[in-house]
Structure formats: C-alpha cells, structure tokens
Amino acid sequence: MGLRAGGALRRAGAGPGAPEGQGPGGAQGGSIHSGCIATVHNVPIAVLIRPLPSVLDPAKVQSLVDTILADPDSVPPIDVLWIKGAQGGDYYYSFGGCHRYAAYQQLQRETIPAKLVRSTLSDLRMYLGASTPDLQ
C-alpha cells in the first residue's frame, strides 16, 4: 500500500502558459508525459512513492547537486503521476528522474520541482502490473 499524501502542494516558478525552456535532448517542453503541462509544483519529497529501485551514477548526482546550487532553474522538474484512490486519497508516484531525486535528497531539500501528471489506477498498473496496490 502506498503512502497517502496530505496537505496542499506549492507551485514553483511561473504560472500556467509560461515558457518551459528546453527539455531532454533539447526538445521544448520536457518529457513525453508532461510536455503540455506548464505548471511546476514544489512537491514534498516525503509524499513521493518510488516503487522501483534506482541505479545511480554518483558523478551524475554530484553534477546535479552542483547545478542545483548554482542555477536551480536549469534543472528540469521530475514527472510525478498523481492518482486519486478509490476513497479520494492522493498518491504521488515517481518513476523517472532518479538522479535529480537523489540530488535533492543529498541537499536535504524538503521539496522537489515536479510536473503533476493526472493519472489513473490503470496507468499505474502499466508500470507495476500485479504489484499495483489497492489505493484508497
């Protein structure tokens, strides 16, 4: 069973419709999942559910730490699947962005910039298969 997130998420940076800048590989707008989402939220790291173990390159994590300290706006936000449980609970799943996640953890930040991708239990099942929890 996943953790249930409480409290409101805080928005970061510019509002909806603001220019996004370049995403991975120089593409405008970020990832395939969140390319059309302009709003970036400061999501509490404590509410993120990361069910898959990460394989990290320590040098890449350190490079991101250095970049976050020097120019945090140049680091793209992570994508977070936002799923409503059967009884209205909010669940925030993160599968990618493992190096960015580790960098923010190393910096002992309480939040991480993220784009919330509204998703469903069916979407989550695509990632987790039979291991998908019964979200309340």
Swiss-Prot record:
Task performed by this protein: Contributes to oxidative stress resistance by reducing cysteine-sulfinic acid formed under exposure to oxidants in the peroxiredoxins PRDX1, PRDX2, PRDX3 and PRDX4. Does not act on PRDX5 or PRDX6. May catalyze the reduction in a multi-step process by acting both as a specific phosphotransferase and a thioltransferase.
Residue(s) carrying Omega-N-methylarginine: 11
Biological process, per Gene Ontology: response to oxidative stress
Domain of life: Eukaryota
EC number(s) recorded for this UniProt protein: 1.8.98.2
Catalytic activity: S-hydroxy-S-oxy-L-cysteinyl-[peroxiredoxin] + [protein]-dithiol + ATP = S-hydroxy-L-cysteinyl-[peroxiredoxin] + [protein]-disulfide + ADP + phosphate
InterPro entries recorded: ParB/Sulfiredoxin_dom, ParB/Sulfiredoxin_sf, Sulfiredoxin
Family per record: Belongs to the sulfiredoxin family.
Lineage of the species this protein comes from: Eukaryota, Metazoa, Chordata, Craniata, Vertebrata
Species of origin: Mus musculus (Mouse)
Top-rank EC class of the record's enzyme: oxidoreductase
Protein name, entry field: Sulfiredoxin-1
GO MF terms, alphabetically ordered: ATP binding; oxidoreductase activity, acting on a sulfur group of donors; sulfiredoxin activity
Named cofactor requirement(s): Mg(2+)
Subcellular location field: Cytoplasm
Region of interest (Disordered), residue spans: 1-30
Ranges of biased composition (kind: Gly residues): 14-29
Binding site for ATP: 97-100
Residue stretches of biased makeup (Low complexity): 1-13
UniProt keywords, alphabetically: Antioxidant, ATP-binding, Cytoplasm, Disulfide bond, Magnesium, Methylation, Nucleotide-binding, Oxidoreductase, Phosphoprotein
CDD domains recorded: Srx (cd16395)
